[in-house]
From Swiss-Prot:
Role of this protein: GTP-binding protein that is not required for the biosynthesis of Mo-molybdopterin guanine dinucleotide (Mo-MGD) cofactor, and not necessary for the formation of active molybdoenzymes using this form of molybdenum cofactor. May act as an adapter protein to achieve the efficient biosynthesis and utilization of MGD. Displays a weak intrinsic GTPase activity. Is also able to bind the nucleotides ATP, TTP and GDP, but with lower affinity than GTP.
Induction record: Is expressed at very low levels under both aerobic and anaerobic growth conditions.
Family: Belongs to the MobB family.
PANTHER family xrefs: MOLYBDOPTERIN-GUANINE DINUCLEOTIDE BIOSYNTHESIS ADAPTER PROTEIN, MOLYBDOPTERIN-GUANINE DINUCLEOTIDE BIOSYNTHESIS ADAPTER PROTEIN-RELATED
Binding partners and assembly: Homodimer. Interacts with MobA, MogA and MoeA in vivo.
Pfam (any one): MobB
Identification of the protein by name: Molybdopterin-guanine dinucleotide biosynthesis adapter protein
One example GO MF annotation: protein homodimerization activity
């Protein structure tokens, strides 16, 4: 696979319902506007399928193909069957990406991975600030309320400010 140089991985970690996907849907265009080419790895606890029953690719995969690539002029997707394997680790998944097309890999979830992360907190989402896990990998907390923390505190509703923070963090990673 082309472009196997290491690029920064930055996770966004939070409890379900905090708005990780909602935030990333706004942050990704803001990063693109700054000339950053982001990739994304999203963790899900649910059984998922990017293919549809009845489609040829779905039927061929269900017939026993261990890996299937579905390709069109606009995009392609690789599906790998892993029912008997332990959960894949994030570094393996990142190694599957063509980093020659990326400047940054954003990660939704994988909160226990030892990579840089921004933890999200929303008041009224069912948790208390005291429950936040701030370890050595947390570079900031994005919140909608003031918090007294030993890491950077960002406004979760200020997408432009978050994008600026991410760009500055990336520049520090690149020396």
């Amino acid at each position: 696979m082309a472009g196997k140089t290491m690029i920064p991985l930055l996770a966004f970690a939070a409890w379900s319902g905090t708005g990780k996907t909602t935030l990333l849907k706004k942050l990704i265009p803001a990063l693109c506007a700054r000339g950053i080419r982001p990739g994304l790895i999203k963790h899900t606890h649910h059984d998922m399928d990017v293919d549809k029953p009845g489609k040829d690719s779905y039927e061929l995969r269900k017939a026993g193909a261990a890996q299937t690539i579905v390709a069109s002029q606009q995009r392609w997707a690789l599906m790998t069957e892993t029912p008997d394997e332990e959960e894949l680790d994030l570094q393996f998944l990142a190694s599957r990406m063509d980093t020659s097309k990326l400047d940054l890999i954003l990660v939704e979830g994988f909160k226990h991975e030892e990579i840089a992360k921004i933890v999200l907190f929303r008041d009224g989402a069912g948790h208390r600030p005291e429950e936040l896990v701030i370890d050595r990998h947390v570079i900031a907390v994005a919140s909608d309320v003031p918090l007294n923390l030993d890491v950077a505190l960002l406004d979760i509703n200020d997408v432009e400010g978050l994008a600026d923070f991410v760009v500055e963090w990336m520049q520090k990673q690149n020396g």
